[in-house]
Amino acid sequence: MALSLSLFLGGRVRTSLARCGFASQVMAGPGSVSCEPDPDSDWEPEERELQEVESALKRQKKAMRFQKIRRQMEAPGAPPRTLTWEAMEQIRYLHKEFAESWSVPRLAEGFDVSTDVIRRVLKSKFVPTLEQKLRQDQKVLKKAGFTREIGQLPVSEDTLKALSAGRSVSGLLMAGDEVSSKSQNHSTALKVAKSHPHSTDAQKKREGRDKRIQVLEESLVPATTALGHQRELQKSATSDSEATGRAGSDTLPSAVLLEELKPGEPGDQSFSSKVVQRGHDFFDSNGNFLYRI
């Protein structure tokens, strides 16, 4: 790039010198060298082109210096892989088929990585073997938060056939492992939650409101129970007093009966003229029970 720009710049300089008559004087022979500009020539476009070339060279040198400083500041070697091969293939497909809607910044935001990682994925032309895909996807899944140790899976012929048929590597890694399948479902739920943050916030608010209502109901249950118990006690006390009143009215003799039982008055000859009291009970002289107070 720098060589082509320098050749282009040299050609422009030679053209400018030829216009001012320097080349013709050299070809004619020795003598006084005088560069008289042609009054009909236009110098502004030539100067503009020279300035553009110089600014392009400066920008290129600045970019090269920046890249050099960046390589010195960063850790040596490739950055740790955070994407599975399935995700990288999806990134390449989206950028190729829908380049306008899926730009590099949007891909970085959607896959939760930096723009440098997206550019590295798009620039890479490396095609790994099936064993390398399995091994690298295992590392990515471990680094994503799956604390359970995933053993080295033997690459059988069935696995190779499934991969060649188009099945995802992550699906094969999770096959036959219950805990790993649960963790994969958890990661899928996290992706859905990230893609729908508003629905997640609304669900959290609804759950918080339900919890508050449940706490209020639990706090109101003891008070309601105590109030109901108190009302039941009042009702039982009222019913007991009413029953006692009814029992007293049933046991107490009426005024007519007392008048009939007065001694010395002619009446029923079955009653004796003498009434004996024993506590709250009253008996006649023969020992027959009369009434109770």
UniProtKB/Swiss-Prot annotation:
Residues 1-18 form the signal peptide. Glycans are attached at residue 185. GO terms for cellular component: extracellular region; intercellular bridge; mitochondrial matrix; mitochondrial membrane; mitotic spindle; nuclear body; nucleus. The modification Phosphoserine is found at residue 41. One of its GO terms (biological process) is cell differentiation. It is found in: Nucleus; Secreted; Mitochondrion membrane. It comes from the Eukaryota. The keyword Flavoprotein does not apply. Expressed in heart, brain, liver and kidney. In brain, mainly expressed in neurons rather than glial cells. Pfam families: Neugrin. Induction: Highly up-regulated in neuroblastostoma cells by RA and MG132 treatment inducing neurite outgrowth. Residues 177-210, 224-254 are annotated as: Disordered. GO terms for molecular function: rRNA binding. Residues 198-210 have a biased composition (Basic and acidic residues). Keywords: Developmental protein, Differentiation, Glycoprotein, Membrane, Mitochondrion, Nucleus, Phosphoprotein, Secreted, Signal. Its main location: nucleus. Transmembrane segments: none annotated. Plays an essential role in mitochondrial ribosome biogenesis. As a component of a functional protein-RNA module, consisting of RCC1L, NGRN, RPUSD3, RPUSD4, TRUB2, FASTKD2 and 16S mitochondrial ribosomal RNA (16S mt-rRNA), controls 16S mt-rRNA abundance and is required for intra-mitochondrial translation of core subunits of the oxidative phosphorylation system. Forms a regulatory protein-RNA complex, consisting of RCC1L, NGRN, RPUSD3, RPUSD4, TRUB2, FASTKD2 and 16S mt-rRNA. Interacts with 16S mt-rRNA; this interaction is direct. Belongs to the neugrin family. This is Neugrin. The gene is Ngrn.
